[in-house]
From Swiss-Prot:
<keyword id="KW-0346">Stress response</keyword>
<comment type="function">
    <text>Has probably an essential function in the transcriptional regulation of the kdpFABCQ operon.</text>
</comment>
<dbReference type="Pfam" id="PF00582">
    <property type="entry name" value="Usp"/>
</dbReference>
<comment type="similarity">
    <text>Belongs to the universal stress protein A family.</text>
</comment>
<dbReference type="InterPro" id="IPR006016">
    <property type="entry name" value="UspA"/>
</dbReference>
<keyword id="KW-0614">Plasmid</keyword>
<protein>
    <recommendedName>
        <fullName>Probable Kdp system regulatory protein KdpQ</fullName>
    </recommendedName>
</protein>
Amino acid sequence: MSARNETGYERVLVPVGDKSDPNMLTELSSILVDPRRGAVRFTHVTTDRSFVGSQENWRTGSDSVAESQHTLREEGIESTGTIRTASSALDGILEEAEEYEADAILIGWTDKDSVSSLVDKLLRKAGCDVIVFSADRDPIDTDSILVPVVVKPDANRLQMLAIMSQRTGASITFTYVTGDEGTDEEGRGLLDQSAERLAEYGVQAETELKSASSAVDALGQLSEDYDVMVIGTSRGWWLRKTLFGRKTDKIAQEAQCSLLMHKWQGEVPPES
C-alpha cells in the first residue's frame, strides 16, 4: 500500500480463471490500484501438464488474461499478463506474487456456501494483503459500504476503505452488534474510534450500534441496505476463530450485498 497521502496499491495480482470474471475483480482492481504509479498483473495458473490439456488451458487462460488487460487499458491503468504452469493453483499464485512483488492479491469468492481450501491457504501463506471478493454488483457502482467492527481497526484496512470510498463516492458505515460477547459501552467506544481514525484519511463515516442475539442474522438484515460489506481478520486471527468457517460461511449466505474479506499483510494466522 502506498503512503497515507497517496492513493492505492502499487502492485496488484489478480488470478483469473478460464471463464469470464464473475466476481468483477478487474473492476475492483481498478478501484484499489494507485492510478498514478500502480499496476495490475493478471495471471492464469494451469496445472494440466498433458499436451492437449495444457494447450487448451493456455488458450482459454490467455483469452481471460487478455480480456482483463483490455478492460484496464481502456481506463488508462497499466497492466501485464502471465500464464504459469504449477503443481497447484496455490503454488502458482504464491510464486507469481513473490516474483511480481505484489502488495495485494485479489481473488474471487465464487461459492458463498463455503470458503474454499484455496482461499483458506492463500490467506495463511501469502506475504501480502489478500482481498477476497464476492460480487453482487459492479464494485464501481458502489454507493454504500457496511463495515462490522469487533476490534480497533488496522491502518491498512482503514486506508483500503478510504480508497474505496474516495474512488466510488460511497458512504461508509461502521456497525457493532452487541449480544453475548459485547456491551453497548464497548460498541460505542469502538465505533467512535473507528470513525475518528477513518477521518484521518479524509473520509467521514456513519456509525450504527445494533443489539441482537445473533450477529449473523443482524448483519444479514443490515446488509440489505448496502452495496458492499467488508469483513476482516482481526483479534489475533479472530476471523479464523469465530468467523472463518461456520460464521463466515453463514454471513456470506445471509449477506444481501457484495462481500469483501480483507487480510492485511501483518496478520499471520497460526498453523492448523
